[in-house]
A protein has these predicted regions:
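Alpha-helical recognition/docking segments in bacterial nutrient-uptake
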Residues: 1-7, 61-173, 177, 232-239
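Conserved functional loop/turn residues at catalytic and ligand-binding sites
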Residues: 10, 16, 21, 30, ...
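Short beta-strand segments enriched in small/hydrophobic residues
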Residues: 14, 19-24, 58-74, 174, ...
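Bacterial carbohydrate/catabolite-sensing allosteric modules
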Residues: 1-2, 46, 87-92, 140-147, ...
Length: 335
């Protein structure tokens, strides 16, 4: 005989209280007498009752669910951010809906609309710039949004990040200090604010401070693929460039392998500094010098900020900038 599911009605009947009282106990409402609360909890334990999250949401107008929009679930950069998000979500009793967007604007919009339809309490957005449709979708909803580990083209959205402009400036300055007059910037799309505004500006800041004239021919914009920069590596070195600051680790490994496979030694003939310090930087040889971002902390702080927004507390910052560093490895000299 099939075992009947234990419902809130079952608990109320066994405890001889109303379903409203059981609901208040389950949702942590303080307006229940201690003796009554304990009686309900004892029945819940004895019957092994598992409250239905959707039903609880209908009662409290909250679903205790957060949507996380991630561009590429296999990318270690976003995976580390997600780990920090998940740990804090668990601490505050929130469930996570993880949605992969594949860097596709149409899919991102569909994903966000789906999360809104599921009535999530908040959204953490990992990715780059917002399309006009997505911006309108965010603004038309009362659901709070936090941007994690990036810069987008909507400064009104709360964000947790490092100072990407300052970090880029420090990386390029280090390469310039190694007597390189021709330092390239290798980047994915400059259409993304994080690259076209912050990192490009940091690159130009370092050049200006060192008295080196900016040459737009040294800004190598790619489609973000490993293959494209791998194929361009030899031509870049042959053009007289002796060092490059690269905006993500995937591209940096492509550049490194392209140089190495063409007999160009790193760091003897060419130096590289990358940006994210994911596992990619330590799995290649030589290992890559990189800007180090506290990715786990960025994810964790993003989730904590979102909890404050969802609870509408006053003690919150809308733009949180965490510290970064540069980790020296084998792709640069003078470690």
């Amino acid at each position: 005989m099939e075992k009947q599911a234990v419902t809130i009605y079952t608990v109320a009947r066994e405890a001889r209280v109303s379903m409203a009282t059981v609901s208040r106990v389950v949702n942590g409402n303080p307006n229940v007498k201690p003796a009554t609360r304990q009686k309900v909890l004892d029945v819940i334990k004895r019957l092994n009752y598992r409250p239905n999250a959707v039903a609880r949401g209908l009662a409290s107008k909250r679903t205790t669910t957060v949507g996380v929009v991630i561009p590429n679930i296999t990318n270690p950069y976003f995976a580390e951010l997600a780990l920090g998000i998940d740990d804090i979500a668990s601490m505050y009793k929130y469930n996570i809906i993880l949605a992969n967007s594949d860097y596709d604007n149409d899919k991102i919009l569909k994903v966000v609309r789906n999360l809104h339809a599921k009535q999530v309490d908040g959204i953490i957005f990992m990715g780059f710039d917002l399309s006009e449709e997505l911006r309108a979708e965010f603004k038309s909803s009362s659901t709070p949004v936090v941007v994690a580990g990036s810069v987008v083209n909507d400064k009104e959205l709360p964000a947790v990040r490092i100072d990407y402009r300052k970090a880029a400036k420090e990386a390029v300055a280090r390469l310039l200090d190694h007597n390189h007059d021709h330092v390239a910037l290798v980047t994915s799309s400059l259409g993304y604010s994080i690259n076209g505004d912050d990192r490009l500006s940091g690159y130009q800041d370092a050049l200006a401070e060192a008295g080196v004239q900016f040459d737009d021919q040294l800004v190598i914009e790619t489609d973000g693929s490993y293959k494209q920069i791998y194929d361009q590596a030899k031509a870049l070195a042959d053009s007289g460039v002796k060092a490059a600051y690269v905006t993500n680790d995937h591209l940096a490994v492509g550049l490194l392998n392209g140089l190495t496979d063409n007999g160009i030694k790193v760091p003897t003939d060419f130096e590289i500094i990358s940006s994210n310090d994911t596992t990619y930087t330590r799995l290649c040889r030589p290992m890559l010098t990189s800007i180090s971002q506290p990715l786990y902390d960025i994810g964790a702080v993003s989730m904590r900020l979102l909890t404050k927004l969802m609870e509408d507390t006053d003690d919150r910052e809308n733009d949180v900038i965490l510290d970064h560093s540069i980790v020296s490895r084998q792709s640069t000299r003078l470690q």
